Design a protein with these regions (language model features):
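An anion-binding catalytic pocket shared by soluble metabolic enzymes
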Residues: 2, 9-92
Length: 92
């Protein structure tokens, strides 16, 4: 199960922190721009939710999707960039 997976939990925490660092360093504006991470050994990725400000991001708000871009865990919609990120991970 994704919610109980310690690797997914750690990626959620790491990515939430990285997004806050992007904003703090002036590398993104409003809600545009995001990073993602592929879950090692699984056809899953973790990505920022759509429309959520960087200051409001938490590990719990990060979204887990499969490599087709379909949300498999998380309460919010994934980023509008999810399809691009999923495409890259499918072809790496």
């Amino acid at each position: 199960m994704v919610k109980d997976d310690p690797v997914v939990s750690e990626l959620r925490r790491t990515l939430a922190g990285l997004h806050q660092a992007l904003a703090a360093n002036g590398l993104v504006a409003w809600t545009s721009g995001n990073a993602s991470a592929r879950v090692p050994g699984r056809d899953l990725l973790v990505i920022k939710p759509s429309g959520v400000g960087y200051d409001d991001l938490t590990a719990e708000s990060m979204v887990v999707c499969d490599l087709d871009g379909t949300r498999v865990d998380g309460d919010l919609s994934p980023s509008s960039d999810t399809a691009s990120h999923a495409y890259i991970y499918r072809h790496m």
